[in-house]
From Swiss-Prot:
The keyword Chaperone does not apply. The keyword Phosphoprotein does not apply. Belongs to the G-protein coupled receptor 1 family. It comes from the Eukaryota. Glycans are attached at N44. This is Probable G-protein coupled receptor 142. Orphan receptor. GO terms for biological process: G protein-coupled receptor signaling pathway. PROSITE patterns: G_PROTEIN_RECEP_F1_1, G_PROTEIN_RECEP_F1_2. It is a multi-pass membrane protein. GO terms for cellular component: membrane; plasma membrane. Residues 88-102, 162-185, 246-264, 326-365 are cytoplasmic. Keywords: Cell membrane, G-protein coupled receptor, Glycoprotein, Membrane, Receptor, Transducer, Transmembrane, Transmembrane helix.
Length: 365
């Protein structure tokens, strides 16, 4: 487990827990203040020989370079600054439809993913602080990150099953569907995903671990691939195929297919999920059995890009919602107008602000 002293790859060796925290270059951030020495990396593994280690690590010429440079810093900063406000805007919408609660729960899990992984883990600890953190904090963050990812995926699975029942078993769906039942199902999924995140306390960092993967490493990585991709994709494939088949049968009978907005959103969300997460799963298994990330710069770059695509999944859902649903577009428009109004009020004198507020109240009345 070695570290490169090249300043352009320093942040590559910063804290990247759950291997969803990707490489970046701090050349423009820390060159003036950081001496060009080989720093002790944050320990993120279950190997006891790293506990209590202090000092500098020897350089390793085999360390794969960080070829992505400063691009991930800009990418994830834009991703967070754009994705978090619009995700909060989605939560401002109100409805009594059970299917809509699944969308709101999916939004909430996306917010948690963005805050923990992108801001706390990647930008704050890696790009801003550029320092080590206690091992217990790193491992606890692993639990939260994996739990947030698993919750986001499995809430989408719940949403898929709900749409399947609504189209293929409409009478049963109307009799059993209710906001209370939906809330209990979402709460159960969140509780189970928190439990599934606990074993990832011992997740090893693929960016720095030079030792061959142990049995625990293989079990955790395969468990992650099964929980977050293979099992959900099989559910999506079966249910979406049944939904599309039912819609085609309605069209052949001369009836209108009646593709609701929720169903259209569902098909888009699941398709994008399968496409955007596939590269990450492929590269992870390639790293596990063929070439490690820490030695081959091509695998290093491939995992960078794959992780960026996987994180993009939390953002493209919003564009899909707005493209299909008038409710989302109206909500976002209203939130933007409210923010603009608040900024305008702050820039006006006190008397003018009172007049504007009175006019607004008079208009509503």
């Amino acid at each position: 487990m070695h570290l490169n002293s090249n300043p352009n790859s320093y942040i590559c060796d910063a804290y990247q827990h759950a291997d969803l925290l990707w490489s970046l270059s701090p050349h423009v951030l820390t060159k003036a203040v950081q001496p060009q020495v080989t720093l002790l990396p944050t320990v993120n593994g279950s190997n006891p020989r790293y506990d209590g280690v202090d000092g500098h690590w020897p350089e390793s010429p085999e360390r794969s370079p960080c070829v992505a440079g400063i691009i991930p810093v800009i990418y994830y900063s834009v991703l967070l600054s754009l994705g978090l406000p619009v995700a909060l805007a989605r939560l401002a919408a109100r409805t009594r439809k059970p299917s809509y609660h699944y969308l709101l729960a999916l939004t909430a899990s996306d917010i948690v993913t963005q805050v923990i992984i992108v801001f706390v883990g990647f930008l704050l600890q890696g790009a801003v602080l550029a320092r080590q953190v206690p091992q217990a904090v790193v491992r606890t963050a692993n639990i939260l990150e994996f739990a947030a990812n698993h919750a986001s995926v499995w809430i989408a699975v719940l949403f898929t099953v709900d749409r399947y029942n609504a189209l293929c078993r409409p009478l049963r769906h109307r009799a059993t569907s209710s906001p209370g039942r939906t809330h209990r199902a979402i709460a159960a999924v969140i509780g189970v995903t928190l439990l599934t995140g606990i074993p990832f306390y011992w997740w090893l960092d693929v960016w720095r671990d030079a030792d061959p993967p142990s049995t625990m490493d293989k079990l955790l990585k395969w468990a992650h691939c099964l929980i977050v991709y293979f099992i959900p994709c099989n559910v999506f494939l079966v249910t979406n195929s049944a939904i599309i088949l039912r819609l085609r049968k309605r069209g052949q009978r001369g009836l209108r297919p009646l593709v609701s907005k929720s169903t259209a959103i569902l098909l888009g969300v699941t398709s994008l999920f399968a496409l955007l997460w596939a590269p990450r799963i492929i590269v992870m298994l390639y790293h596990l059995y063929v070439a490690p990330v820490h030695r081959d710069w091509r695998v290093h770059l491939a995992l960078d890009i794959a992780n960026m695509l996987a994180m993009l999944n939390t953002e493209v859902n919003f564009g899909l919602y707005c493209f299909i649903s008038k409710t989302f577009r109206a909500t976002v428009r209203q939130v933007i107008c409210d923010v603009h109004m608040a900024c305008a009020l702050k820039s006006q004198p006190k008397q003018t602000v009172v007049e504007l507020m009175l006019k607004s109240v008079g208009t509503e009345l």
